[in-house]
């Protein structure tokens, strides 16, 4: 899905222009999702510029959410995460995919089981809810049992506010990657 789309960080000014347009178009905005990538990869001062604009211009907004990668969460200090929460970041959606390190390696996740657990716990400890997604069927027939057991233990080690499960069903001979 994302192979054809090149990731690039948008300038905060561009995001503020989009928000200004949305303010003119919509009378009441209760939820804002900072979409199309991982907003947590931004330096905190840039993300705070966006959150402060939302606070000022969308006083009725009850919730701001975004996608996040474990590595980007781990680059932020507890103080930085708490500051994001104070300025309205309510929840981060994170794809863990599996609790099995073998499966994470097999699908080239680029993050370890330990990083995923630590990042979710850091978010929750800073007052930001984590919504974590796992993928049933991702391990294939060889690793299904390890995938299931390790995912269960990982969920137990996380302090996530929400956990969801997606199901992957491939038709043979579809490659996993």
Predicted regions and their residues:
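Canonical Radical SAM [4Fe-4S] cluster-binding loop centered on the CxxxCxxC motif
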Residues: 1-17
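Short acidic, glycine/proline-rich loop/turn micro-motifs
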Residues: 2, 103-106, 175-176
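Short, solvent-exposed loop/turn segments at secondary-structure boundaries
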Residues: 7-10, 43-45, 105-108, 142-146
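Conserved C-terminal portion of the radical SAM core fold
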Residues: 34, 91, 114-175
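Aromatic/hydrophobic pocket-lining residues that form the small-molecule binding cavity
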Residues: 12-15, 47, 77, 116, ...
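Conserved SAM/AdoMet-binding glycine-rich loop
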Residues: 23-125, 129
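A short, flexible beta-alpha/helix-coil linker loop
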Residues: 2-5, 39, 99-101, 136-139
């Amino acid at each position: 899905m994302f192979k054809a789309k090149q990731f690039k960080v948008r300038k905060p000014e561009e995001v503020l222009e989009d928000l200004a347009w949305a303010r003119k178009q919509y009378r009441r905005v209760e939820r804002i999702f900072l979409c199309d990538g991982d907003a947590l990869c931004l330096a905190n001062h840039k993300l705070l510029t966006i959150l402060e604009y939302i606070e000022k211009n969308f006083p009725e907004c009850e919730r701001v959410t975004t996608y996040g990668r474990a590595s980007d969460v781990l680059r932020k200090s507890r103080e930085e995460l708490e500051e994001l929460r104070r300025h309205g970041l309510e929840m981060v959606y994170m794809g863990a995919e599996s609790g099995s390190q073998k499966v994470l390696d097999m699908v080239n996740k680029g993050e370890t089981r330990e990083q995923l657990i630590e990042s979710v716990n850091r978010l929750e400890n800073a007052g930001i809810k984590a919504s974590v997604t796992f993928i049933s069927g991702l391990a294939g027939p060889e690793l299904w049992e390890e995938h299931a057991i390790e995912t269960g233990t990982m969920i137990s080690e996380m302090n996530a506010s929400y956990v969801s499960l997606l199901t992957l069903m491939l038709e043979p001979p579809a490659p996993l990657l």
